[in-house]
């Protein structure tokens, strides 16, 4: 009787062990599947960002090269396609399962949300306009390389707003990106700027630096807002912020377009466009579409990872622009510009590697309590 009981108990234990192994295998395969889907989404968003921003930038320069003169139009191209994000929000809402979390966190008040959307929208309109002025006066290759300094500004503002630590890798990135931009401003004589005076070149440089600073400030603010204001990190919160700030920025730029009187010159500008009326419309429409696909990619990366990661992926596409500029616009590619590209890529890699180390450290801290809990059980 005792032996049969032992066999019965052993059988129960084996059955329980098999069931536990089966449950562990199923629970392990589900996160793996989710992780693969997440990285597939991240890859798609990254492709949107890497390729669409350079294409939109080149099309903006093509508009200027062939008779376009309105900086407000180029600014508007970066913003006016925001209704695409409304569709993106609609589909993400369908896909997102209903939350069963009983811990309800209070949503921000209407006044708080309105203030956030208004302030970020004004900042977005400001840096979009500054980048349009910079693109007008600078060769597109120089413009894109200076714009890479947005990584340095993101780290700088995150130090004050988000307690970002200045590790040796971050300091190295800041130094390299600063030197990369400085090389371009001291080497104006070698640039192909026959239609631009030295004063206009300096104005373009200052405006592009200002645009980079604005991008860094907005991304750091977004990170701060999702820590202090939008405590529930949902796709709806990310997309609402992107939609409403774009709406505010678009309204501000439209007011500027009509107040400046530039809208009166648009019909004659289209008639006198060197590539023809159809090309004029296609250039502007394509640029607006590429900018919005780029925005969808940025918003997706912010939601899937972080604003810092989104900004890092943005910087990957910037070295593509100088290569395209040499082919399309015959920009000069001298030794100083090549060295500037190398420094910018080096600074970017340093920044991304630090982000990788931070993510790895965060995952280790999150998994350690779980491992300790399983060991105690």
UniProtKB/Swiss-Prot annotation:
It holds the Pfam family PUNUT. The keyword Transport applies. GO terms for cellular component: membrane. Keywords: Membrane, Transmembrane, Transmembrane helix, Transport. PANTHER family: OS09G0467300 PROTEIN-RELATED, PURINE PERMEASE 22-RELATED. GO terms for molecular function: purine nucleobase transmembrane transporter activity; purine nucleoside transmembrane transporter activity. It comes from Arabidopsis thaliana. Belongs to the purine permeases (TC 2.A.7.14) family. Signal peptide: none annotated. The gene is PUP22. It is found in: Membrane. It is a multi-pass membrane protein. It comes from the Eukaryota. Its main location: membrane. The keyword Manganese does not apply. InterPro entries: PUP_plant. This is Probable purine permease 22. The chain crosses the membrane at residues 39-59, 71-91, 107-127, 128-148, 166-186, 202-222, 238-258, 283-303, 309-329, 338-358.
């Amino acid at each position: 009787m005792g032996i049969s009981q032992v066999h019965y108990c052993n059988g129960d234990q084996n059955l329980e062990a098999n069931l536990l192994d089966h449950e562990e295998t199923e629970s392990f395969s589900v996160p793996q599947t989710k992780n693969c889907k997440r990285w597939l989404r991240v890859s798609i968003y990254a492709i949107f960002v890497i390729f669409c921003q350079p294409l939109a930038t080149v099309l903006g320069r093509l508009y200027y090269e062939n008779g376009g003169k309105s900086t407000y139009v180029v600014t508007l191209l970066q913003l006016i396609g925001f209704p695409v994000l409304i569709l993106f929000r609609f589909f993400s809402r369908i896909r997102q399962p209903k939350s069963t979390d009983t811990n309800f966190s209070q949503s921000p008040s209407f006044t708080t949300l309105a203030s956030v959307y208004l302030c970020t929208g004004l900042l977005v309109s400001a840096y979009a306009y500054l980048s349009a002025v910079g693109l007008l006066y600078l060769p597109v290759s120089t413009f894109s390389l200076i714009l890479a300094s947005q990584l340095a500004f993101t780290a700088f503002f995150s130090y004050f707003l988000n307690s970002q630590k200045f590790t040796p890798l971050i300091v190295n990135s800041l130094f390299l990106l600063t030197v990369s931009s400085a090389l371009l401003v001291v080497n104006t004589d070698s640039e192909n700027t026959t239609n631009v005076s030295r004063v206009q070149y300096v104005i373009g440089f200052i405006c592009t630096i200002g645009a980079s600073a604005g991008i860094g400030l907005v991304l750091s603010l977004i990170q701060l807002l999702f820590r202090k204001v939008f405590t529930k990190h949902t796709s709806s919160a990310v997309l609402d912020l992107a939609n409403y700030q774009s709406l505010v920025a678009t309204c501000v730029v439209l007011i500027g377009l009509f107040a400046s009187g530039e809208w009166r010159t648009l019909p004659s500008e289209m008639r006198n466009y060197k590539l023809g009326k159809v090309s004029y419309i296609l250039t502007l429409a394509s640029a607006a579409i590429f900018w919005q696909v780029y925005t969808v990619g940025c918003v997706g990366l912010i939601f899937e990872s972080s604003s810092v990661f989104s900004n890092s992926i943005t910087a990957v596409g910037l070295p593509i622009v100088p290569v395209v500029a040499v082919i399309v616009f015959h920009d000069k590619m001298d030794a100083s510009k090549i060295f500037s590209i190398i420094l910018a890529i080096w600074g970017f890699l340093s920044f991304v590697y630090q982000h990788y180390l931070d993510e790895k450290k965060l995952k280790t801290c999150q998994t350690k309590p779980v491992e300790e809990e399983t060991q105690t059980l």
